[in-house]
Regions:
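Short, positively charged and aromatic/hydrophobic N-terminal segments
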Residues: 6, 13, 21-22, 28
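Catalytic cores of DNA base-excision repair glycosylases
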Residues: 29, 33-250
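Short microdomains enriched in Cys/His and/or Lys/Arg
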Residues: 242-270
């Protein structure tokens, strides 16, 4: 559940020849309707992140599939370091299928779990050649049959390549969705988060929303010590409210004043 401010007090700020009145939020909140919350989130990201795309480097569907398989529990930056040589020598399913896992391993040894991923790449390439005419399928059930491809990877391919209303839920999407109240606390699995997001985002925005949430989680709403000062969603963020209960510091985006948290009070003792 997200929140808006209620039970407001007045804080007066004097400036030369001007008296400005702004709202001071207290600890009492009222629920925000779900669609209102989603509209606020969409408006914010449309303004701050009008272009939101995958950071993986690729030139065709096969290369994106390879890159996404490699990105499991690995950073996009690391994947982008190894794929140029890999794509140079194995530009398509046929050349990769004609190789073997041991050879592929040498190209991806700096990636997490290189042994398993080398086997997955080789198996995936063989299945594409033998069963799908060397084409990456668009159907979810066909995609998840490929070695190394789970629901998350399949949804990335569907959204990015085929522009389908598919929401891939990784750790960033999961974290951000809960923090800003896009999904209820009962959504404890990636699948339940996926269904809730797909249900509430407009279908045409789902592929873009996937990247909004990933990039926001990767660079701003990070797992530890999120950069709340750089975030325009703190007013609807449950995590921010929980961390700043009884805080006497102004909200970074609005100037709203809260009392200091117990942790902050302890740090300020002389």
């Amino acid at each position: 559940m997200a929140f808006t401010w209620d039970n407001q007090e007045k804080l007066r700020i004097l400036q030369p020849e001007t008296e400005i009145t702004i709202s001071q939020a207290t600890s009492k909140y009222t629920p925000m309707k779900k669609q209102e919350l989603y509209h606020k989130v969409i408006d914010y990201f449309e303004q701050t992140m009008p272009v939101a795309e995958t950071e993986l480097h690729y030139n065709n569907p096969f290369q994106l599939l390879v890159a996404v398989i490699l990105s499991a529990q690995c950073t996009d930056k690391r994947v982008n370091m190894v794929t140029p040589n890999l794509f140079r020598d194995f530009p398509d399913p046929e050349t990769m299928a004609a190789s073997n896992p041991d050879v592929l391993f040498d190209y991806i040894r700096s990636i997490s779990y290189p042994n398993n991923k080398a086997k997955h790449l080789w198996g995936m390439a063989n299945m594409l050649v033998n069963e799908y005419h060397s084409e990456v399928p668009s159907d979810l059930d066909q995609l998840v049959r490929l070695p190394g491809v789970g629901r998350k990877t399949a949804n990335v391919i569907q959204a990015v390549i085929f522009e389908k209303a598919a929401m891939a839920v990784d750790t960033h999407v999961f974290r951000v969705s809960h923090r800003i109240g896009l999904v209820p606390a009962r959504c404890t699995t990636p699948y339940s988060v996926e269904k809730e997001l797909v249900r509430n985002f407009p279908a045409e925005l789902i592929p873009k929303a996937h990247h909004w949430l990933i990039l926001h989680g990767r660079y701003t709403c990070i797992a530890r010590q999120p950069k709340c000062d750089a975030c325009g969603l703190v007013m609807i963020c449950k995590h921010y409210q929980n961390q700043h209960k009884l805080s006497a510091q102004p909200c970074p985006q609005t100037g709203t004043v809260h009392n200091k948290s117990k942790k902050e009070k302890g740090q300020n003792k002389s």
